Structures are given as C-alpha cells and as structure tokens.
Amino acid sequence: FVLPFDVLDSGRDLDRGWPYA
C-alpha cells in the first residue's frame, strides 16, 4: 500500500497515474 504523497504535494501526478511520480 502506497500513500499518494505526490498527489497531496502536486496535482500534476494525477495525470501521471498516482501514487507514482
């Protein structure tokens, strides 16, 4: 399980497919 830290930090990662950055 990986928390969407990148999503919380920057919405741009949503387009990249979170929680991966």
Curated annotation (Swiss-Prot):
Coiled-coil parts of chain: none
Subcellular localization(s) per the UniProt record: Vacuole
Primary location class: other
Keyword Metal-binding: no
Keyword set includes Ligase: no
Keywords (A to Z) from UniProt: Protease inhibitor, Serine protease inhibitor, Vacuole
Cellular component aspect of the GO annotation: vacuole
Induction per the UniProt record: By infection with Phytophthora infestans.
Tissues and organs where the protein is expressed, per its UniProt entry: Tubers.
Molecular function via GO: serine-type endopeptidase inhibitor activity
Further comment: Has a single chain structure.
Family of this protein: Belongs to the protease inhibitor I3 (leguminous Kunitz-type inhibitor) family.
Record's function text: Inhibits trypsin and chymotrypsin (serine proteases). Does not inhibit elastase, subtilisin, cathepsin L nor papain (serine and cysteine proteases). Protects the plant by inhibiting proteases of invading organisms, decreasing both hyphal growth and zoospores germination of Phytophthora infestans.
The protein's name in its UniProt record: Serine protease inhibitor 3
Organism ancestry: Eukaryota, Viridiplantae, Streptophyta, Embryophyta, Tracheophyta
